[in-house]
């Protein structure tokens, strides 16, 4: 004998199906949105080194204001987007500045910023905690500047270019200290930009942080 669902069961099945369909549509829209944002940030990452007027070049070292902002902004979306934009910004430096050590330094954004994006994904609440986000910023800056210093040291130590020992030491100190300050300034620019834009547009890490804050408020009220 064939079983027929009662109207109530059919209603709930239709409702569940509609909710699943809505979730799938939202997921597809989010993927398309993130792809567009990744492309825009990558374009900015290429243009900033080429067009930014605030740029300091000392020998083989280069410090361009806001050069890290696109890849750091991508950290507030996902590790995958961060990696994609990091490669794009490296291309930007390769096009605009014909200095191999600068290319290598730019390439170091790939591991450092991607790991940073994973940390923010795990602890999204950091973006609303002023002390913790600056501690994160400082640690990120240390690894960022440290890895860039290490790769430049390896470049000269392996004989790809010649430089006097004293000049090399000064150069490495410049990259380490200047890179740390540069990284922290650019991260705060990216954080401020993300904080403002999150009020008008969905940004993954800021949305997760907001949800966590709301859950804590509900628990506190209970």
Curated annotation (Swiss-Prot):
Keywords: Cell membrane, Membrane, Transmembrane, Transmembrane helix, Transport
Segments crossing the lipid bilayer: 34-54, 72-94, 101-120, 135-155, 167-187
Compartments where located: Cell membrane
Signal peptide: none
Gene3D superfamilies per the UniProt record, alphabetical: 1.10.1760.20
Topological relation to the membrane, as annotated: Multi-pass membrane protein
Principal subcellular localization: membrane
Disulfide bonds: none
GO molecular function term, any single one: ATPase-coupled transmembrane transporter activity
Entry GO terms, CC: plasma membrane
Protein family (similarity comment): Belongs to the vitamin uptake transporter (VUT/ECF) (TC 2.A.88) family.
Assembly and oligomerization: In L.lactis forms a stable complex with EcfA, EcfA' and EcfT. In E.coli forms a stable energy-coupling factor (ECF) transporter complex composed of 2 membrane-embedded substrate-binding proteins (S component), 2 ATP-binding proteins (A and A' components) and 2 transmembrane proteins (T component), probably with a stoichiometry of 2:1:1:2. May be able to interact with more than 1 S component at a time.
Its job: Probably a niacin-binding protein that interacts with the energy-coupling factor (ECF) ABC-transporter complex. Unlike classic ABC transporters this ECF transporter provides the energy necessary to transport a number of different substrates. The substrates themselves are bound by transmembrane, not extracytoplasmic soluble proteins. Uptake of niacin into proteosomes containing EcfA1A2T and Niax has been demonstrated. Uptake requires hydrolyzable Mg-ATP and is substrate-specific; NiaX-containing proteosomes did not transport riboflavin.
Name the record gives this protein: Niacin transporter NiaX
Species in which this protein is naturally found: Lactococcus lactis subsp. cremoris (strain MG1363)
């Amino acid at each position: 004998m064939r079983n027929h669902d009662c109207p109530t069961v059919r209603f709930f099945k239709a409702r569940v199906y509609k909710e699943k369909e809505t979730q799938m549509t939202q997921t597809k829209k989010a993927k398309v949105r993130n792809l567009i944002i990744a492309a825009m940030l990558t374009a900015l990452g290429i243009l900033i080194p080429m067009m930014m007027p605030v740029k300091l070049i000392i020998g083989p070292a280069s410090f361009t204001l806001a050069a890290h902002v696109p890849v750091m902004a991508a950290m507030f979306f996902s590790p995958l987007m961060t990696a994609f934009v990091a490669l794009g910004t490296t291309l930007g430096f390769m096009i605009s500045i014909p200095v191999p050590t600068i290319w290598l330094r730019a390439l170091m954004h790939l591991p450092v910023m991607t790991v940073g994006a994973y940390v923010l994904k795990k602890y999204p609440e950091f973006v609303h905690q002023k002390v913790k986000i600056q501690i994160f910023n400082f640690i990120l800056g240390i690894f960022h500047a440290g890895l860039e210093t290490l790769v430049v040291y390896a470049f000269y130590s392996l004989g790809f270019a010649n430089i006097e020992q004293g000049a090399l030491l000064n150069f490495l100190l410049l990259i380490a200290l200047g890179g740390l300050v540069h990284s922290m300034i650019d991260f705060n620019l990216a954080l401020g930009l993300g904080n403002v834009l999150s009020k008008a547009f969905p940004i993954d890490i800021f949305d997760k942080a907001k949800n966590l804050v709301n859950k804590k408020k509900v628990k506190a009220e209970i």
